[in-house]
A protein has these predicted regions:
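Pyridoxal 5′-phosphate
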Residues: 1-381
């Protein structure tokens, strides 16, 4: 039985065209990009071409792109690096941030910084009133994600950034889930720093970037040979960076088609969900077109995910980076969802290659598995 992949917010398959662009840097002798000979110069040219591709995809300048190995690394770099070059004050982050933002913010408390979470409403939208109140304390940096990896809710980052800027703080956004699904512009978002990642847009794992306003004073992430403007030393992963650049170019070219196709699949799916007596989260908010997050009373999300996996459907019970946790989704708890319902949460995230037939077949399987699990629960009770 072949499995149907419905977990594209966790990671995506490598596009064959991206792999083709990477192969020369994996199969042939290539130089260190810092070397002066022809092999090194060729590698440097490839890295700089990819930097331009990433910049153009993000509405930024190539000089603002700093390559990292992951979105987690870029987010840690932004939070710790920006705060670290200022006097100990406050770091703010939304209550629905990925752990790779919230945990480094809290870790900075050991070095004398304060950290605090900005609340969201019942639909997953950030409270700007609370943000303004919290900004009355001296603040180094505020980090609010563009689009949530679980609910898909899109924040009004430009408005939030203006509030943060007026308070004299720096603004960072994790745009990992937004790139390739909705138009993303570093300039239009009005932020000082922005994170994007390769493996969410059919590029290779092991490549990401922090887009950084050059006027921001930030501590280096890694000290060494001085690569990436002296901010992230270490020999560049040329093949992965080349792949990231190619993936960015393809993602931007296809973003409108991706959005219309996946929203059609999601709308069809959620119409079918309504007949199954489930709770769909954040339906009233602006969301990523491909993402649906729902829950059933009385059925654990992990149990349903495992059951669906056995039937050939790959979905998630929340963030892939916290899938080893048995705790309810922190995103749903921040939205005021009761823990018992939050434990039943399941995320479906569609991709460009999913089909309407797959959606209708999945709905049939989902209905059958829900009925089966309810019967088992009834017997157990």
């Amino acid at each position: 039985m072949s499995s149907i992949y419905l977990d594209h917010n966790a990671t995506t398959a490598l596009d064959p065209r991206v792999l083709e662009s990477m192969l020369p840097w994996m199969q042939r002798q290539s130089g260190n990009p810092t070397s002066r000979h022809v092999f090194g110069r060729s590698a440097r040219d490839a890295v700089e071409h990819a930097r331009t591709q990433v910049a153009e995809a993000c509405g930024a300048y190539a000089s603002q792109v700093i390559f990292t190995a992951s979105g987690t690394e870029a987010n840690n770099f932004a939070v710790k690096g920006i705060a670290g070059n200022q006097a100990g004050s406050q770091i703010l982050y939304s209550a629905i941030e990925h752990p790779c933002v919230s945990r480094p913010a809290r870790a900075m408390q050991q070095a004398g910084w304060l950290s605090d979470a900005i609340g969201v409403d019942a639909h997953g939208v950030l409270s700007t009133a609370q943000l303004q109140q919290q900004l009355q304390k001296p603040t180094s940096v505020a980090s609010v994600m563009l689009a949530n990896n679980e609910t898909g809710v899109i924040q009004n980052i430009a408005e939030i950034a203006e509030i943060v800027r007026k308070a004299g703080a720096f603004m960072h956004t994790d745009a990992v889930q937004g790139l390739g699904k909705v138009p993303v512009s570093f300039t239009d978002l009005n932020v000082h720093a922005m994170t994007v990642s390769s493996h969410k847009i059919h590029g290779p794992q092991g490549a990401a970037a922090l887009i950084l306003d050059k006027r921001v004073d930030i501590q280096p992430l890694l000290h060494g040979g001085g690569q990436e403007r002296g901010l992230r030393s270490g020999t560049e992963n040329v093949a992965a960076i080349v792949g990231f650049g190619a993936a960015c170019e393809l993602a931007v070219a296809n973003v409108a088609q991706f959005a219309s196709h996946t929203q059609m699949l999601r709308d069809t799916f959620e119409l079918g969900l309504k007949a199954l007596d489930v709770t769909i989260f954040s339906q009233q908010s602006t969301r990523l077109p491909n993402t649906s997050f729902f829950a059933l009373d009385g059925i654990e999300g992990e149990t349903l995910v495992t059951a669906l996996d056995r039937k050939g459907y790959a979905v998630a019970s929340g963030s892939a980076c916290s899938s080893d946790s048995t705790e309810p989704s922190h995103v749903l708890l921040a939205m005021g969802i009761k823990p018992d319902l939050a434990r039943g949460a399941v995320r479906v995230s569609f991709g460009a290659h999913n089909t309407l037939l797959q959606v209708t077949d999945f709905l049939t399987t989902l209905k059958n598995e829900i009925l089966r699990l309810k019967q088992l629960t009834g017997v157990a009770a």
